[in-house]
């Protein structure tokens, strides 16, 4: 079988004598005329293929069918404009891109008679064209002996350029030359695809003044492609190729790329409007670098102009064309962008169109070198992943960056310290804001207005609150001011409210502990971490919500135990959140708490759900859409001046009288009609929160406050100052 195939393949390679004695020559066509007809047919096939949106591989296959057909038949008997549509119709089916017969006929008519309207499909002329095309397809099949599998040089070009690790420019140019060889020459009838590929690479090296070094084995690169190739043969064929390019008239050099023309019309690209002369001049300049030969110069102008004139087309060869297609795509893009359309020699025009075509076409060859070239380009273009998001950026991006920020916080121990200090500062600020807000509480009439404020961005909320509390702008409030407020606190009210809230939080905590304490605490720990990250980020909803509920709790304590208990019970019925968050919220959002206290006293019941507002449940409000800008603004104030006082109150918490706390919790639970919870969980919470959950620790600290009306002492060593936040 292999021997038969080789014999069949040899059948389609002809000597110079056979080419000079072709049927068309015998019927009186001179050599130049016959070559011109072949180039015109190739141009028509290229134009039709692009309009039909078939791959460059299909177009190249149709061109080879045409060349072989006219080695058996004459141009005088079968007009090139009739054979070309039939050859493309057949090649499209062979390459598995079949097109409707009606579509092929209409496209052929549009290419040959652009000024005329499309034929009526019911007219006699159209039906006659259909019959002629089908008959011609049958004649082509019989003439070719049903040998429809075509090997193209593009595959070998890609393989060789990959083997020698040629530059992208060299690979693209070589691939382009392979397409030109099909469009402009009869090399496909004289030499095997590997030989043609060597000629194309050699021509590209000469043209661009490149040189491929000898291998470590002492062999030249072409010996790895085809053992029969010699340097003399390459020089001879290169010279012949250049001569053909020089002889090709400009009208054939200019590839009529329909797709490119349409794109040019739509985009009105300026670079495509540049003069033909300019492009040719550029090509000549490039050629002069490699050689002063007039033939080389002609080749250069041809190839360059063709590349510039070509528009994105499909990849050019079957397998090889597919591999080359990638290279050609790169080449086509570069050339097209840099140069306007020019008159190209037919081969050049085809090359360029082919390169453009490569952009849209699949080729098995692309798996070879083209893929490599494309992958290199893609790799280089890939952007480096962005660095960890900074706090400012995170705040700006809000929720989108939340996940990344959470991961960062989990992975960085430094965040733990910052959280610790942050919680302590929040505690102090909470006390401060609590007293100030309580003083001004009467200003706000109803709870409803308050909630919108809380839900609005924190900055707005701060503005609302601060005018009420102290008349200062949220953003403008400074650490010094905060200190002053703390000193001026109304000790009795504030402490009472704090104590109540502490006991409530304690109560909630115990309750949660009695429930799957381990699982809940782990969840709390993670949520706590995230909530911390969220606060700076300004995206978390949990925190703001927590403060509100927690503040409400404290407010209730202010008003009455019964009211607070009823409220807490109602609120707890919402989703249960980590208790830590509640405690943290109390500290973090003092202003909010105070405000909520005021609002709760006025219209408390309608908005709140049922269930004791315990620390664990304070996170229930985490679902609420409170924006954290206020947290952001407040954070800098608290953090700047306040060290981790009792680090979330952990240090103070340890001094709490256990029995008193338990008794208080029992009494509160009984008031609410709930059974007291198990004490052991409480101890676990203390240790856990102390080491893992600074925020949880805040809750115990609160209970500690219950025993001690005084504010927790500031830490001996304040935490390092945090970077200033954006205003």
Swiss-Prot record:
Main localisation: nucleus
Low complexity bias (residue ranges): 302-322, 562-572
Annotated positions of the ADP-ribosylhistidine modification: 489, 532, 558
Coiled coil: 386-427
Chain positions with N6-acetyllysine modification: 392
Subcellular location: Nucleus
Residues found modified as Phosphoserine: 117, 390, 497, 501, 566
GO cellular component terms attached to this protein's record: cyclin/CDK positive transcription elongation factor complex; nucleus; P-TEFb complex
Cross-link (Glycyl lysine isopeptide (Lys-Gly) (interchain with G-Cter in SUMO2)): 343, 417, 483
Molecular function terms from GO: 7SK snRNA binding; cyclin-dependent protein serine/threonine kinase activator activity; molecular condensate scaffold activity
Location of region: Disordered: 302-326, 486-591, 692-727
Chain segments carrying region Histidine-rich domain (HRD): 482-552
Compositional bias segments (type: Basic residues): 509-532
Compositional bias (Pro residues): 711-727
Compositionally biased tracts (Basic and acidic residues): 486-508
Chain location of the short sequence motif Nuclear localization signal, and interaction with Tat-TAR RNA per the record: 253-270
Keywords: Acetylation, ADP-ribosylation, Cell cycle, Cell division, Coiled coil, Cyclin, Host-virus interaction, Isopeptide bond, Nucleus, Phosphoprotein, Transcription, Transcription regulation, Ubl conjugation
Binding partners and assembly: Cyclin-T1 is the predominant cyclin that associates with CDK9 to form a heterodimer called P-TEFb. P-TEFb forms a complex with AFF4/AF5Q31. Component of a complex which is at least composed of HTATSF1/Tat-SF1, P-TEFb complex, RNA pol II, SUPT5H, and NCL/nucleolin. Component of the 7SK snRNP complex at least composed of P-TEFb (composed of CDK9 and CCNT1/cyclin-T1), HEXIM1, HEXIM2, BCDIN3, SART3 proteins and 7SK and U6 snRNAs.
Entry text on domains: The histidine-rich domain (HRD) region is intrinsically disordered and promotes the formation of phase-separated liquid droplets that enhance binding of the P-TEFb complex to the CTD (C-terminal domain) of the large subunit of RNA polymerase II (RNA Pol II).
Family: Belongs to the cyclin family. Cyclin C subfamily.
Protein task: Regulatory subunit of the cyclin-dependent kinase pair (CDK9/cyclin-T1) complex, also called positive transcription elongation factor B (P-TEFb), which facilitates the transition from abortive to productive elongation by phosphorylating the CTD (C-terminal domain) of the large subunit of RNA polymerase II (RNA Pol II). Required to activate the protein kinase activity of CDK9: acts by mediating formation of liquid-liquid phase separation (LLPS) that enhances binding of P-TEFb to the CTD of RNA Pol II.
Protein name, as recorded: Cyclin-T1
Organism: Equus caballus
Organism lineage string: Eukaryota, Metazoa, Chordata, Craniata, Vertebrata
The encoding gene: CCNT1
């Amino acid at each position: 079988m292999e021997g038969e195939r080789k014999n069949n393949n040899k059948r389609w390679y002809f000597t110079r004598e056979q080419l000079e004695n072709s049927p068309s020559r015998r019927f009186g066509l001179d050599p130049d005329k016959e070559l011109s007809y072949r180039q015109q047919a190739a141009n028509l096939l290229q134009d039709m293929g692009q309009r039909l949106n078939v791959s460059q591989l299909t177009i190249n296959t149709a061109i080879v069918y045409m060349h072989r057909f006219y080695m058996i038949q004459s141009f005088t008997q079968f007009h090139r404009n009739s054979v070309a549509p039939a050859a493309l119709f057949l090649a499209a089916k062979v390459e598995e891109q079949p097109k409707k017969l009606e579509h092929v006929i209409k496209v052929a008519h549009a290419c040959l008679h652009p000024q005329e309207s499309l034929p009526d499909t019911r007219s006699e002329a159209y039906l006659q064209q259909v019959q002629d095309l089908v008959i011609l397809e049958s004649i082509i099949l019989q003439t070719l002996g049903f040998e429809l599998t075509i090997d193209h040089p593009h595959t070998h070009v890609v393989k060789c350029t990959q083997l020698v690790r040629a530059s992208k420019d060299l690979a693209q140019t070589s691939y382009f030359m392979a397409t030109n060889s099909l469009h402009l020459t009869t090399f496909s009838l004289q030499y095997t695809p590997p030989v043609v590929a060597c000629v194309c690479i050699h021509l590209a090296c000469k043209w661009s003044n490149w040189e491929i070094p000898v291998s470590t084995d002492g062999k030249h690169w072409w010996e790895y492609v085809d053992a029969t190739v010699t340097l003399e043969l390459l020089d001879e064929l290169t010279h012949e190729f250049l001569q053909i390019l020089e002889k090709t008239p400009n009208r054939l050099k200019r590839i009529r790329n329909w797709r490119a023309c349409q794109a040019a019309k739509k985009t009105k690209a300026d670079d495509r409007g540049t003069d033909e002369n300019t492009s040719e001049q550029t090509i000549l300049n490039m050629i002069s670098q490699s050689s002063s030969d007039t033939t080389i110069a002609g080749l250069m102008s041809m190839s360059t102009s063709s590349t510039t004139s070509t528009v994105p087309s499909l990849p050019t060869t079957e397998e090889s064309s597919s591999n080359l297609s990638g290279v050609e795509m790169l080449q086509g893009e570069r050339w097209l962008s840099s140069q306007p359309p020019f008159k190209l020699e037919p081969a050049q025009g085809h090359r360029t169109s082919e390169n453009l075509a490569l952009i849209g076409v699949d080729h098995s060859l692309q798996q070879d070198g083209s893929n490599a070239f494309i992958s290199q380009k893609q790799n280089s273009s890939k952007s480096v992943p962005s660095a960890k998001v900074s706090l400012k950026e995170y705040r700006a991006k809000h929720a989108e960056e939340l996940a990344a920020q959470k991961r960062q916080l989990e992975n960085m121990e430094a965040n733990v310290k910052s959280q610790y200090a942050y919680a302590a500062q929040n505690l102090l600020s909470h006390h401060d804001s609590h007293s100030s807000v309580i003083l001004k509480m009467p200003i706000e009439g109803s709870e409803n207005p308050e909630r919108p404020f809380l839900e609005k961005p924190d900055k707005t909320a701060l503005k609302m609150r601060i005018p009420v509390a102290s008349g200062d702008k949220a953003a403008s409030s400074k650490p010094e001011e905060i200190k002053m407020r703390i000193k001026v606190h109304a000790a009795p009210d504030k402490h009472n409210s704090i104590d109540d809230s502490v006991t409530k939080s304690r109560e909630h905590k115990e309750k949660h502990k009695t429930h799957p304490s381990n699982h809940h605490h782990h969840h709390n720990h993670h949520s706590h971490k995230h909530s911390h990250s969220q606060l700076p980020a300004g995206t978390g909803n949990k925190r703001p919500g927590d403060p509100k509920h927690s503040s409400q709790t404290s407010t209730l304590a202010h008003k009455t135990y019964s009211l607070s208990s009823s409220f807490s019970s109602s609120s707890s019925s919402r989703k249960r959140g980590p208790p830590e968050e509640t405690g943290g919220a109390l500290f973090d959002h003092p202003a909010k708490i105070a405000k909520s206290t005021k609002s709760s006293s006025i219209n408390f019941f309608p908005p709140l759900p049922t269930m004791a507002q315990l620390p664990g449940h304070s996170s229930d409000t985490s679902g609420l859409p409170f924006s954290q800008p206020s947290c952001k603004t407040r954070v800098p104030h608290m953090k700047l001046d306040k060290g981790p006082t009792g680090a979330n109150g952990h240090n103070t918490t340890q001094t709490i009288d256990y029995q008193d706390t338990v008794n208080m919790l029992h009494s509160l639970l009984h008031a609410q009609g709930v059974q007291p919870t198990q004490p052991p969980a409480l101890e676990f919470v203390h240790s856990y929160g102390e080491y893992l959950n600074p925020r949880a620790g805040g809750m115990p600290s609160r209970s500690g406050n219950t025993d001690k009306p005084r504010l927790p002492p500031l830490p001996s060593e304040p935490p390092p100052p945090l970077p200033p936040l954006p205003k």
